[in-house]
């Protein structure tokens, strides 16, 4: 299925039905009083978070939603029938904003969370409501109210505890395969990851967290180059970023230090808040280095990057160091409440 994470839709709630001016007409009662019923309520439009969905593609092809108007009132004090509501199912993590003003309408963070998008109009009043001691035969009635209508922007941002950050082919997809049940495509060419992948990392019984892998970043990503810029927003909800660095690139012209600095620069250009998010360095593919050089290479990278925070040397392919990494992440997240709980 094609991954769509941003669309524009239009929602039109139904108008309320009109009230009616009617009078009671029965045998032997030639001049009965008013009995005009009220109009029915117009249909409203709701959004409902559904954890079974993972894309907004349905709204790319069906962007307009119109609820029906309420029925008009009738005589004999009969009220018009209210119109059915429309419920739009959306993935958990969808942010809904007003397309014109940018104002936040809803942030669907919980499964089955239901939010009103456009309210249906109230039904009009029948002439029964206007009867008084001075007006025994009122002919007044009111029309139904108009339903609300809006242009909305739907933006899907994945809900994950940990985000993987790195250049194409740094080994992000291999890592998420190694520590979770996720099975993203892995190959020896750039951009094998074309959309975010989520994996549940289970450390112990009842202890787990969610990891997100996005397409790799390249220089110029903040200005729109490559694929990663489009998906950087998916890291905004994470508690921790893992900066994956390939310490043994096949291309000898690639300098891991320069590449790491370029990626951090792109991150800062894109979003200062994301740049300041807690971040650990993960030196991947250490198994490709001679054993007696591995520590020296890591030390050199730490000094060149002036890095004093946490770091790990791993091999996502062989699994070396991955268990220690996941336990460290779990311990870090457990200090930050709330974290993802396994169900």
From Swiss-Prot:
Annotated signal peptide: none
| EC number of the protein | 3.6.5.-
Q: Which residue range or ranges hold the Obg domain?
A: 1-159
Checking InterPro entries in the record gives: G_OBG (IPR031167), GTP-bd (IPR006073), GTP-bd_Obg/CgtA (IPR014100), GTP1-OBG_CS (IPR006074), GTP1_OBG_dom (IPR006169), GTP1_OBG_dom_sf (IPR036726), OBG_GTPase (IPR045086), P-loop_NTPase (IPR027417)
The superkingdom of the source organism is Bacteria
Essential cofactor(s): Mg(2+)
Query: MF terms per GO, please?
Result: GTP binding; GTPase activity; magnesium ion binding
What family does the database annotate? Belongs to the TRAFAC class OBG-HflX-like GTPase superfamily. OBG GTPase family.
Record note on quaternary structure:
Monomer.
HAMAP family hit by this protein: GTPase_Obg
Q: What is this protein called?
A: GTPase Obg
Gene coding for it: obg
